[in-house]
UniProtKB/Swiss-Prot annotation:
TM region positions: none
EC number from the UniProt entry: 1.5.1.5, 3.5.4.9
Pathway: One-carbon metabolism; tetrahydrofolate interconversion
Domain of life, source organism: Bacteria
GO-annotated molecular function: methenyltetrahydrofolate cyclohydrolase activity; methylenetetrahydrofolate dehydrogenase (NADP+) activity
UniProt cross-references to Pfam families, sorted A to Z: THF_DHG_CYH, THF_DHG_CYH_C
Catalyzed reaction equations: (6R)-5,10-methylene-5,6,7,8-tetrahydrofolate + NADP(+) = (6R)-5,10-methenyltetrahydrofolate + NADPH; (6R)-5,10-methenyltetrahydrofolate + H2O = (6R)-10-formyltetrahydrofolate + H(+)
Membership in a protein family: Belongs to the tetrahydrofolate dehydrogenase/cyclohydrolase family.
Keywords from the UniProt entry: Amino-acid biosynthesis, Histidine biosynthesis, Hydrolase, Methionine biosynthesis, Multifunctional enzyme, NADP, One-carbon metabolism, Oxidoreductase, Purine biosynthesis
Record organism: Legionella pneumophila (strain Paris)
Phylogenetic lineage: Bacteria, Pseudomonadati, Pseudomonadota, Gammaproteobacteria, Legionellales
Record's GO cellular component terms: cytosol
Name under which the protein is recorded: Bifunctional protein FolD
Residues involved in NADP(+) binding: 166-168
Length: 284
C-alpha cells in the first residue's frame, strides 16, 4: 500500500491564510506591516529564484519586503555596514541574508552581526543556544516547519526514535534539537557515520538532509517509517527530486514528504511567521 503523503503545500497554504489574518489584525491596531529585509549578494540562479519566492510570499500575507540586491563583488565590510543599518532601522523586523554567500565573505561573521531579535532565519548562535536550552524564540525555519508538518498530521515523535541524516548548521543540527525538545530519542548520522544502513533501518522517523541523491538506499526503508526528505535537486530534464528516490520509497514506508511540495513550502511560511513574531515582540 502506498505511503500517505505529508503535503507541505496544503499545510503552508492554511498557515499563510492564518498569518495573513494576524498581519491584518496587527495593522488594524495601528501598527505598520511587519518588515522583512531580504539581502541577495550576486546572481546565483537558484538564490535568485528562492529570493523571488520569499518576496512574493511576503506580499501575499501583507508583510513588507525590503529588497537589497548587491553585486557579487560586495565586500564583507560593506555587507556588515548594511546589516548594521538594518539592525537600527525601525522599519525592519527581520533580516534575511540569502545563503550561500560568495567565498570571500565569512558566513558565520555575517550571521553573528545580525541582531538576534531580527534573525528570522534562526541561525544566530544566541537563537540556536536558546533552542538548545529548551527556551526557543526565533527558530531555524526548515526544522520548525518540519515539526509543524508532523504536528498537523498528528505524527508524534515523543518516545520514538528519530534519525537525522546530515549535520549541517541549517538543518541537521537544529533539527536534532527540535526533535529532542519534542521528546524523541535522536540519532544524528553524517559523513563519518559507519554502518549507516543499520541506523536507517531502526528509525521510526527519518529526516534526510544529505544534499546528495541516493545516499539512502530504498531497500533500507521499513513499512512503519515516517520519511521527511529535505533535499532538492534539479535534474537535466528540468524535473526536481529529493535526496531519496520518491517513486520507490512511497511504496515502502508509512508516511513521506514529496519533493517538491513537502518541506520547501513550510520553510517559507515559517520564515514569514518568524517575521510576524519578531514584529510583535519589537512592539512590546
Amino acid at each position: 500500500m502506498p505511503a500517505s503523503l505529508i503535503d507541505g503545500r496544503e499545510i503552508s497554504a492554511l498557515r499563510r491564510n492564518e498569518l495573513k489574518q494576524r498581519v491584518q489584525h496587527h495593522v488594524g491596531l495601528g501598527q505598520r506591516p511587519p518588515g522583512l529585509a531580504v539581502v541577495l549578494i550576486g546572481n546565483d540562479p537558484a538564490s535568485v529564484i528562492y529570493v523571488s519566492n520569499k518576496r512574493k510570499a511576503c506580499e501575499e500575507v501583507g508583510i513588507t519586503s525590503h529588497s537589497y540586491d548587491l553585486p557579487a563583488e560586495t565586500t564583507q565590510e560593506k555587507l556588515i555596514q548594511l546589516i548594521n543599518e538594518l539592525n537600527q532601522s525601525d522599519k525592519i523586523d527581520g533580516i534575511l541574508i540569502q545563503l550561500p554567500l560568495p567565498k570571500h565573505i565569512n558566513e558565520r561573521t555575517i550571521i553573528e552581526h545580525i541582531k538576534p531579535e531580527k534573525d528570522v532565519d534562526g541561525f544566530h548562535p544566541y537563537n540556536l543556544g536558546r533552542l538548545a536550552q529548551r527556551n526557543p524564540f526565533l527558530r531555524p525555519c526548515t526544522p520548525l516547519g518540519i515539526m509543524n508538518l508532523l504536528h498537523h498530521y498528528e505524527l508524534n515523535v515523543k518516545r520514538k526514535h528519530a534519525v537525522v541524516i546530515g549535520a549541517s548548521n541549517i538543518v541537521g543540527r537544529p533539527m536534532s534539537l527540535e526533535l529532542l525538545l519534542a521528546g524523541a530519542t535522536v540519532t544524528i548520522c553524517h559523513k563519518f557515520t559507519q554502518q549507516l544502513q543499520k541506523f536507517v533501518e531502526i528509525a521510526d522517523f527519518l529526516i534526510v538532509a544529505t544534499g546528495k541523491m541516493d545516499v539512502i538506499a530504498t531497500d533500507w526503508l521499513r513499512e512503519h517509517q515516517v520519511v521527511i526528505d529535505v533535499g532538492m535537486h534539479r535534474l537535466p530534464d528540468g524535473s526536481i527530486r529529493g535526496d531519496i528516490d520518491f517513486k520507490k520509497a512511497v511504496e515502502k514506508v508509512a508516511w513521506i514528504t514529496p519533493v517538491p511540495g513537502g518541506v520547501g513550502p513550510m520553510t517559507i511560511v515559517t520564515l514569514l511567521e518568524n517575521t510576524m513574531m519578531s514584529a510583535a515582540r519589537l512592539r512590546e
